[in-house]
Amino acid sequence: MREVVIADTGPLVAFLVRQAQHHRWACETMATLRPPLLTCEPVLAEAAHILRRHGCDTDPLLALIERGVLNIAFSIETELAPLRQLMRRYRDQAMSLADACLVRLAELHDKPRVWTLDSDFRVYRRLGRLVIPILMPDDESRKK
């Protein structure tokens, strides 16, 4: 079974915004990933909001879905009970709905890896206790 890459907001925005701090890293990483990357609607909503806030067009984000690079592979309605449980468990982290959806997506796949800039994913656990593998710039590059 192949690894499933789950895309978070930060790398998607960094990939699409040339001026973003992690643009180069996001582009280099994207070039190594095998589509489709899985994501959820809250991540897309966050990304669209951030893109607009920075004066960027949201069309390239939607084009990633249209081209099959991103796949919306999640239903909040179907996964409502586990999402509520995750958000209660990580109340102290102020877990967002987007993060809860990504953790739940990681729980639904045997070999997940979350592509993120969010250090909270170092704390979150799938299925209660399993570390979630992440794709994240190393700590030195995050300080630059």
Per-region residue spans from a language model:
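Active-site neighborhoods of divalent-metal-dependent phosphate/nucleic-acid chemistry enzymes
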Residues: A73-W115, S119
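Residue-level signal for well-ordered alpha-helical positions
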Residues: R18-Q19, I50, L86, L127
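Short, well-structured N-terminal submotif of metal-dependent ribonuclease cores
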Residues: M1-T39, L51-A63, L135, D139-K143
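A generic structural signal for short hydrophobic patches within well-formed alpha-helices
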Residues: L12, L44, F121-R122
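Acidic, PIN/NYN-like endoribonuclease modules and their adjacent C-terminal/linker elements
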Residues: R2-V4, I72, L108-K144
